[in-house]
């Protein structure tokens, strides 16, 4: 599986999602995480937690497209953590993967920027027709009006399909930065749904 995690807005749980997905994927095969963010958040996380069960490399430039294709031959799974506010790097990353996950919270600002990110994904699909995109709600609280409103707004807008799986607001996840994640259940559910929803899909 080759996944890019992207959102042009920061603060949506993007790097956390990339790290957790890489951990979950590593349970089924060798996994590489490519950190394309010039801030190096994922690389710093990996540096502080050398026990992470996957490899990490930093490629904070549009060269990620070429390097990802080369590196993917050595690993069963690939996760690319893309930067906020760098559409050139993000676009390059999206040309080299099969899946893109766009994490967003239930905040109204996230929803506005979500549309811009979706446009970037659509442009990448014109170049990479095998690319399938999904939105993922993060930092959610069950049975809240904001959660229901965001789900309805995304469905009405007809943008990227929204995964049923969600990442709840939990201290174990929010405080995991720089450590080895210990509870992968929510992200394992994300992977299960991605596998189920992309099985048999054609570009």
Please report, for each region that a protein language model flagged, where it lies by residue.
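C-terminal boundary of histidine-terminating zinc-finger modules
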Residues: 175-194
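Conserved C-terminal guanine-recognition region of P-loop GTPase G domains, centered on the G4
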Residues: 114-130, 138
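Structural beta-sheet core signal
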Residues: 32-33, 80, 102, 135-137
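P-loop/Walker-type NTP enzyme "switch/lid" segment
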Residues: 2-8, 19-91, 127, 168, ...
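Beta-strand-loop-alpha "switch" segments that mediate conformational coupling across diverse proteins
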Residues: 139-141, 151-180
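Conserved lysine of the Walker
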Residues: 14
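Inter-motif core of Ras-like GTPase G domains
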Residues: 87-108
């Amino acid at each position: 599986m080759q996944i890019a995690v992207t959102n042009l807005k920061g603060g949506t749980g993007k790097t956390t999602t990339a790290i957790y997905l890489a951990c979950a994927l590593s349970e089924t095969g060798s996994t590489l995480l490519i950190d394309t963010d010039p801030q190096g958040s994922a690389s710093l996380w990996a540096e502080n937690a050398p026990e992470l069960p996957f490899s990490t490399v930093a490629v904070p430039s549009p060269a990620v497209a070429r390097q990802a294709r080369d590196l993917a031959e050595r690993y069963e799974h690939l996760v690319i953590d893309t930067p906020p506010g760098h559409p050139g790097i993000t676009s390059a990353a999206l040309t080299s993967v099969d899946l893109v996950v766009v994490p967003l919270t239930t905040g109204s600002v996230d929803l506005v920027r979500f549309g811009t990110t979706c446009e970037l994904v659509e442009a990448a699909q014109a170049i990479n027709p095998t690319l399938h995109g999904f939105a993922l709600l993060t930092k959610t609280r069950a049975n809240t009006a904001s959660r229901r409103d965001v789900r309805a707004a995304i469905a009405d807008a007809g943008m990227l399909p929204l995964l049923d799986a969600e990442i709840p607001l939990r201290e174990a996840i929010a405080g995991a930065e720089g450590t080895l994640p210990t509870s992968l259940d929510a992200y394992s559910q994300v992977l299960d749904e991605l596998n189920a929803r992309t099985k048999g899909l054609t570009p």
